[in-house]
């Protein structure tokens, strides 16, 4: 009886992405949610990332922009993260509570309206541009409303005379609860949403 040889070639994929959410997995690992230019919204597991000796240590924080390499899962939508090369930490997004809240809302909103693992480079570019803008300018109501309006345009759900938030709710259901918190934090203004 002759044995068979199994291919040891691993399939690896690469993309530029922004960390939109991070959750703990067990004692040492993390689940990292990404918005990627080439892969869309996706999740990876970073094994042993919470260990101080991990090659991921200090690299997997909210809003980090990086080149990532992962091994696709055949069984689920949770892929195995292999490498991360950070190109931007965006520490300015943590300079104030309002900037952090609005940036997090942008990520949550995108996750609630975009299809998983379906690349739409324009959505990545919108999020990236919004985070970069917030890194340089204080968070305000106008920025939040502009992001929502651009998102409705890119998704094809915006209509003349219809509030962007209302258009998003009509097309995708309830908006993230953090929107209300952001608007309260940013105060009343002429562009009340």
Task: Put a short name on every predicted segment.
Residues 2-193:
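Non-catalytic alpha-helical scaffolds and adjoining flexible linkers that form interface surfaces
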């Amino acid at each position: 009886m002759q044995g068979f040889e199994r291919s040891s070639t691993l399939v690896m994929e690469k993309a530029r992405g922004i960390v939109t959410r991070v959750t703990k997995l067990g004692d040492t690992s993390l689940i990292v949610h990404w918005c990627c230019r080439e892969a869309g919204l996706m999740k990876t597991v970073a094994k042993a990332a919470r260990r101080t000796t991990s090659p991921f240590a200090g690299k997997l924080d909210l809003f980090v922009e990086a080149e990532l390499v992962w091994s696709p899962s055949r069984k689920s939508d949770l892929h195995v993260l292999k490498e991360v090369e950070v190109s931007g930490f965006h520490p300015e997004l943590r300079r104030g509570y309002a900037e952090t809240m609005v940036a997090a809302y942008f990520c949550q909103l995108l996750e609630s309206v975009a299809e998983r693992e379906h690349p739409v480079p324009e959505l990545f570019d919108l999020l990236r541009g919004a985070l970069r803008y917030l890194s340089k300018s204080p968070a305000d109501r106008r920025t939040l409303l502009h992001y929502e309006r651009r998102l409705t345009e890119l998704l094809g759900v915006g209509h003349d005379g219809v509030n962007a938030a209302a258009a998003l709710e009509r097309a995708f259901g309830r908006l993230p609860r953090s929107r209300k918190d952001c608007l309260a934090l940013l105060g009343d203004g002429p562009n009340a949403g």
